[in-house]
Amino acid sequence: MSMGSFGFALAVMVLAVLVASAAGAPNTNFVSSACNTKKIPSGNPFFNNLGALLVNLEKNTAFSGYDYKASRAGSGGAPTAYGRGVCKQSISQSDCTACLTNLGGRIWGICKNAIGARVQLTDCFIRYEQYSI
């Protein structure tokens, strides 16, 4: 391999490493939480509303300016669930979605069925409540 070919190959490898590291997974390290002390009673239909709301936040925040509010109307006499998803502007849309999906799966364990919660990971944030936010 000539020196010119070697230099070109080296430049391509360095560029590939830089692109791969820039497109890495989101940082889902736990930062903080605030959980309402009131709990959702077992079997309450609010769980279904809240579950649908979290999926909505996970799927739409990245495509709504990285700061998205939504609500899920109550069914079966349950209160409406209100929520907000936020991602750092510096991450990709796919990393935003991945971060919120990760957080959506962890929020139950962090806040133990609380009727309201705010949980921050390094790259994303979810808040949900039983009142408009």
UniProtKB/Swiss-Prot annotation:
Q: Which residues bind alpha-D-mannopyranose?
A: 36, 118, 129
Signal peptide segment: 1-24
Which stretches make up the Gnk2-homologous domain?
A: 28-133
Identify the species of origin. Answer: Picea sitchensis (Sitka spruce)
Q: State the Gene Ontology BP annotations.
A: defense response to bacterium; defense response to fungus; killing of cells of another organism
Q: Which InterPro entries does the annotation name?
A: Cell2Cell_Antifungal, GNK2, GNK2_sf
Question: Under what name is this protein listed?
Answer: Antifungal protein ginkbilobin-like protein 1
Which regions span the lipid bilayer? none
Q: Which UniProt keywords apply?
A: Antibiotic, Antimicrobial, Disulfide bond, Fungicide, Lectin, Mannose-binding, Plant defense, Signal
Q: What does this protein do?
A: Exerts antifungal activity through its carbohydrate-binding specificity.
Kindly list the cysteine pairs connected by disulfide bridges: 35-111, 87-96, 99-124
Q: Which domain of life is it from?
A: Eukaryota
- Entry's Pfam families? Stress-antifung
